């Protein structure tokens, strides 16, 4: 199912980012400062990163809000690619949402680990939005812990939206803290239950162990989620991330509100 979200608290600004608690701010992507907003519908047009800039020759833009949902596979969440028709991983990909894919550090499957050499470690301050941060959320019913992972600027503005829309389902939540990698802390790639925005945002469940993460075989099935007592919280987080994850572009009233209607995507629970 899906729903709207809850969130961690804001974090200090990373060097790649600048954001405000009102859900807007800016990032540096492709050598250009670009405004972001939790109410942006996205940018339909694409442009090419100039030579001399990081990832010169790749394209940025083209991703809209109704295409932000991926799957549990690293390399999903790209427009028109809600599964992984172009393969696991993010090597050589363009940037439809301007943000870079997440990285998890060493000790992960090869197609995940290789992203470190391309996009830097989780604490890389050159990434659009700054270093990676994570925040945790616990529901009312049990000790199930969900985590959201993304760049600092995204976490700073998304947290307010999540807290606003999912407060009724949250028993406890942490503020956003720097993410040091899967070697030392959650979330780990095998704990991710949903990727968003070209694999630049992830929602995870502590203790979930998706065996498909440990193989390059694209036909390997995902491990089913365990029975959950906090489905309302999971649904709320999932839909609110989709509805309010910051995108490049200006605020639009058409993108406002807690839900995505028909464009919401279900987290697979069996």
Task: Report residues per predicted region.
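Terminal or extended low-complexity segments
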Residues: 110-270
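Intrinsically disordered, low-complexity segments enriched in Gly/Tyr/His/Pro and basic residues
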Residues: 1-98
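Membrane-inserting effector segments that mediate pore formation, membrane fusion
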Residues: 90-107, 111-112
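Amphipathic alpha-helical interaction segments
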Residues: 77, 82, 106-108, 204, ...
């Amino acid at each position: 199912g899906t729903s709207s979200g809850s969130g961690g608290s804001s974090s200090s600004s990373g060097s790649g980012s600048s954001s405000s608690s009102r859900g807007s701010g800016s990032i540096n992507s492709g050598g250009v400062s670009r405004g972001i907003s939790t109410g942006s519908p996205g940018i339909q047009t694409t442009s090419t990163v100039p030579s001399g800039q990081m990832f010169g020759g790749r394209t940025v833009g083209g991703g809209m809000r109704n295409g932000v949902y991926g799957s549990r596979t690293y390399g999903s969440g790209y427009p028109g690619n809600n599964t992984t028709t172009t393969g696991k991983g993010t090597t050589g990909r363009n940037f439809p949402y301007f943000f870079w894919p997440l990285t998890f550090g060493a000790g992960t499957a090869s197609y995940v680990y290789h992203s470190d050499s391309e996009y830097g470690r989780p604490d890389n301050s050159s990434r659009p939005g700054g270093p990676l941060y994570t925040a945790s959320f616990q529901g009312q019913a049990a000790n199930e812990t969900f985590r959201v992972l993304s760049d600092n600027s995204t976490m700073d503005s998304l947290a307010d939206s999540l807290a606003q829309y999912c407060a009724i389902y949250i028993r406890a939540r942490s503020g956003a803290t720097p993410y040091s990698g899967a070697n030392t802390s959650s979330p780990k790639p095998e704990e991710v239950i949903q990727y968003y925005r070209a694999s630049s945002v992830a929602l995870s469940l502590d203790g979930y162990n998706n065996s498909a993460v440990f193989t390059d075989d694209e036909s390997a099935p995902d491990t089913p989620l365990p029975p959950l007592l906090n489905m309302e919280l999971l649904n709320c987080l999932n839909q609110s991330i989709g509805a309010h994850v910051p995108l490049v572009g200006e605020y639009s009233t058409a993108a406002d509100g807690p839900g995505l209607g028909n464009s919401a995507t279900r987290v697979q629970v069996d």
